[in-house]
Amino acid sequence: MTNVFIYPNVEFIAGVDEVGRGPLVGAVVTAAVILDPHNPIEGLKDSKKLSEKKRLLLAEEIKQKALAWSLGRAEPAEIDKLNILHATMLAMQRAVENLKIQPHFVLVDGNRIPQLPMSAQAVIKGDSLVAEISAASILAKVARDQEMIELDRRYPEYAFAQHKGYPTKLHLERLAQFGVLPEYRRSFAPVKKLLSTLLSKNHEYVFKIQK
């Protein structure tokens, strides 16, 4: 951590972060973590700056050493109904609610905070400044990546393990070739455009049934 973050003077502080706002498919996943100040974890940083191997190792260490940790999520149908921002806030609320210890204060990565029953603060670049947020970003990233690997096993033709659901050139090509799965976010532009094109051409289009 290059800069020094001034922590609030309370006992239990939770860090919260999200992964998966940008992908076209799957849930947005959040995590909340309360670290043990007497059992520090070395090497915590923004999950995007860590190798996959290091993330997996740190995720296990976080789960073992943290006083409490939990995951929250908002499904594609909720994202389509609420929009991605509000769905992310909902997933963050769920992560905090799922903690076995209720925090006295919550630090959230970014510039917005969800509605919570305790005090909270948004921290821009918090995943690089606050250990609790870094830990949350790692847990959320590992959890969502594992979900994409599982989706890849079910639908290998989409190459989800490679692009993790983000709108890469490969992903857009496979989406156009194989169609929209139930796990896709239909409100996201590339998916919405494909569905609209198919409907406008009067194609009979049925969502693929899960294998």
Curated annotation (Swiss-Prot):
GO molecular function, one term: RNA binding
Domain RNase H type-2: from-to ranges: 11-200
GO CC annotations on file: cytoplasm; ribonuclease H2 complex
Note on cofactor: Manganese or magnesium. Binds 1 divalent metal ion per monomer in the absence of substrate. May bind a second metal ion after substrate binding.
SUPFAM superfamilies (alphabetical): Ribonuclease H-like
EC number, as in UniProt: 3.1.26.4
InterPro entries reported in the protein's UniProt record: RNase_HII, RNase_HII/HIII, RNase_HII/HIII_dom, RNaseH-like_sf, RNaseH_sf
Principal subcellular localization: cytoplasm
BP-aspect Gene Ontology terms: DNA replication, removal of RNA primer; mismatch repair
UniProt KW keywords: Cytoplasm, Endonuclease, Hydrolase, Manganese, Metal-binding, Nuclease
Cofactor: Mn(2+); Mg(2+)
Top-level taxon of the source organism: Bacteria
Amino acids binding a divalent metal cation: 17-18, 109
Compartments in which it is found: Cytoplasm
Reactions catalysed, as given in the entry: Endonucleolytic cleavage to 5'-phosphomonoester
Pfam families: RNase_HII (PF01351)
Function: Endonuclease that specifically degrades the RNA of RNA-DNA hybrids.
Xref: NCBIfam families: PRK00015.1-1 (NF000594), PRK00015.1-3 (NF000595), PRK00015.1-4 (NF000596)
Family, per entry: Belongs to the RNase HII family.
Protein's name in the database: Ribonuclease HII
Organism classification: Bacteria, Pseudomonadati, Pseudomonadota, Gammaproteobacteria, Pasteurellales
